[in-house]
Amino acid sequence: MRAGNRFVEDLSQMKPNVLFIIDSFEQGGSERQAMQLLTQLHASGQCRVHLACLQNRGSLRAEADQLGIGEIHEYALNSFYDLNFAKQLRRLVRFIKENEIDVVHTHCFYTNIFGMTGAFLAGVRARVTSKGETDGFRSPMQKRVERTSFRLSHRVIANCLVVQNQLIREGVSPAKIIQHYNGLNLERLKVRSGLRREEALAAFGLPSGRRYMSIVANLRNPVKDHPMFLRAAARVRAAIPDVGFAIAGEGELMEGLRELAGQLGIEEDVFFLGRCDNVADLLFASDIGVLSSKAEGFANAILEYMAAGLPVVATDVGGAREAIAEGETGYTVASGNDELMAARIIELLNEPKRARAMGERGKLIAAEKFSCDRHLKNTLELYDELLSKPKSAPTGIGHEWRLNE
């Protein structure tokens, strides 16, 4: 076993075993961020990565399989308060011990609770949780349980300053919190050379001869507030007839949103694209990126809009103001204020030259401030810090790790 040879191996060449635990493989923001970071960690050669999930479903599973990191373990949970939770927890603790996991890194509410409990019981020396959402839809009981997971962790990663400040208000020690912005995969947002706008529109079934405001957000969670987007769209359509509205995302809320579009009289102008595997081409063909969420942490969609060179109009929730330079790269509006959202969109559509300049400014900021390489560097430095501290093991023996430079 690796543990038995620790003191005869060259420690500088030892790679820590890192276990990521994600909720599912759905195309959600936290899942995509986790998969992107896991892919980078694996490619860096600095860690041996392992992956577990709570629900083995979603289109990102194929991407995970292509990494070649070994078996992906599912720990199916129905509740935190039944016998199955204890059963799955025992399985997790056994896996951690058998594979000598050095870092457990969890990425959302449910995995924070399950993963940190198992990692604590297994004595994992580096326990890292993530918080990527603001208040809005967690019950008081859920918040209390999540705070317990933070107490069991060594570090809590907040994906923006708003989330960091919320954690402090909730009683998490500031010394335990570290703030890392989401990383943006610029390669994913590159369009192929020579692509024409009309060609991109046709690929999505979008009629040419229109300008488009687009929203990229799942249709599973009501917190994304697509009804606000549609109400704003109806106002924009009344003022500027040649505008179309593209909704990229899948989920069970789609039919209800179709009905609402009909009630608003814009059913011929709204295009539900479903799951969108090629966001880059859609944004290339769009004129404005919109986000209407009631709550967010640090929205990946805003960064994607900026990287694609689009001006952004988004609700002022989570870290939106940390990404958007007000009046320079886009605008923020109060959640639920579809009238102001429509006014800002109309303003940009009526001033296309200024809108393009705002988009180009946002593109520069996205590349400089929110790169996935910076995110990887921050993560490796965090692991290095935690693993370099002597472990309080039953044997009383500690040692130091160093991730290869």
Task: Name what the model sees in each region.
Residues E31-T39, R211, I215-A238, F245, ...:
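A conserved mid-protein helix/loop that constitutes part of the nucleotide-sugar donor-binding site
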Residues T106-N112, K131:
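Short His-centered aromatic/hydrophobic patch
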Residues A126-A158, N165, E170-V172:
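A conserved, positively charged/aromatic
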Residues C53, P311-A314, I324:
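Short hydrophobic beta-strand element within catalytic cores of glycosyltransferases
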Residues R275, K294:
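Aromatic "clamp/platform" in nucleotide-sugar-dependent glycosyltransferases that forms part
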